[in-house]
Amino acid sequence: MNEVCLKLSDLFVSSGWGGYDRGRAPQWAHPRAQQQWFGAIAALEPFLRQTLPNVGGELPGICLTGPAPVLKDAVLVRNFYQGIATPWEEFSPWPCLAGEESEWSAVPPMREIPLFPQDPLAEEQFCWLMTPQFGLLLLLGKNEQGLAQFYWTFDPEILQQAWLSLQARLKYGLSPDLSLLQKTIAAFNFPQPDFRLVTYFGQLMLDYQPNPYNLPPCQEQESAEPSPDVELLQALTHEVRTPLTSIRTLTKLLLRRKDLSPEVLKRIESIDRECSDQISRMDLIFRATELESTPLPELVVPLTVTSLEAVFQAGIPRWQKQAQRYNVNLQAQIPHSLPQVWSNPSLLDQVLGGMIEKFVRNFNGGGEINLQITTAGDQLKVQFHTQSVHQANPVRALGELLMFQPQTGCLSLNWDVTKNLFQLLGGKLIVRRRSPSEEILTIYLKCEQRTVPVANYDRQFTMV
């Protein structure tokens, strides 16, 4: 089988791993699998800190993930090579030419593994991790019934097969690090793990399961059909996104050329940026229509312990660049240390980005956005104070979900839908309008206060 056409879940299915629990309703397969995935990711860093006390030796660890990085601990980030599987339209060209063999630096880089259009790996979330003591694969994919399934394994054979699949993609992407990765992984030699490691990680995953909820038994009932308006909106967002993705793929290819003038490159970068903004907007609208059309008994967004500090560190520079293009100044007052909150980090970043875009495109002649984060009892208070130089551009309702700005042609989610999204994210949004040019938006998010028990294992494991 061509490794580039292989999904990682195919490795588990072909190895005889079980399918979904037939005692559960199929509509709960995805939220249940997501819950298990979030629990495993939350358990990973505590597990690595406990089992790899001497991080920083001759052979650093390797962590290949998709579609986003999973390691955020500063010590682990310094000592793990990280590769991120990235759709081709989001891929940034390698900073050095293929064939150049790099060396491990003091802080290993975070490289991108380009996924070409239609690559089935883009449909999965995974973390492939290798150290001298053990290897681990975490995967949110699909089972043989086509339903969402969470898999995890320390099995060296499956880890080796997964590496062959990832290695093929690195070859096609002309990774400058491939030779060094091959040598390092050959030195690790896919070790057989100590059984205590497997037991310990399994216990940690149970300890870190996010916001448990009861999944109902399977009941035969007809699913509510989405309204024609919702179906039309979903179809339109798809039709808009598809050509924009193609255009963005072409701009990425053009940006790799060395024979273009600075002025041409500047214009291509502008096209790429506008396509990216539109794609993000369409993604959020599509996600919102999907959630709004889901019947209440089935409407679940799995929540997990979320580093709000990481969300804002990644988002604020991006939002500031976006604001500057519309002559808007975004100032942020972020405390040095923030408690973690219960939320969904991926959707939270998406919704916050949509709010920022709504602000900056609604301002008439520029303006200011002040972001301030404070604690309020057992909650974090995130407040946006927005002020336009002139009266904000008028908007009008477009159906039950959207707002439309006739002057700019901008589409955005209305405040009712945005409030519903924050409620699903474990928070609350309050919108207060002081004047036609000034608004204050306050978001409350529940702080994570539990103490997670840690199994009583030795800090160091003697491997045999």
UniProtKB/Swiss-Prot annotation:
UniProt-listed SMART domains: HisKA
Entry-linked CDD domains: HisKA
Keywords (A to Z) from UniProt: Kinase, Phosphoprotein, Stress response, Transferase, Two-component regulatory system
Catalytic activity: ATP + protein L-histidine = ADP + protein N-phospho-L-histidine
Induction: Expression strongly induced by heat shock at 44 degrees Celsius for 20 minutes, after 60 minutes expression has fallen.
Chain coiled-coil ranges: none
UniProt key word Metal-binding: no
Modification comment: When expressed in E.coli autophosphorylates at 18 to 30 degrees Celsius; less phosphorylation occurs at 36 and none occurs at 42 or 48 degrees Celsius.
Chain positions with Phosphohistidine modification: 238
PROSITE patterns in alphabetical order: HIS_KIN
Molecular function (Gene Ontology), one example: phosphorelay sensor kinase activity
EC numbers on record: 2.7.13.3
Ranges for domain Histidine kinase: 235-449
Pfam families documented for this protein: HisKA (PF00512)
PANTHER family: HYBRID SIGNAL TRANSDUCTION HISTIDINE KINASE C, TWO-COMPONENT HISTIDINE KINASE
Protein function: Member of a two-component system Hik34/Rre1, controlling expression of at least 20 genes in response to hyperosmotic stress (0.5 M sorbitol) or salt (0.5 M NaCl). Represses expression of heat shock genes under normal growth conditions. Required for survival of long-term heat shock exposure.
Protein name from the UniProt record: Sensor histidine kinase Hik34
Source species: Synechocystis sp. (strain ATCC 27184 / PCC 6803 / Kazusa)
Gene giving rise to this polypeptide: hik34
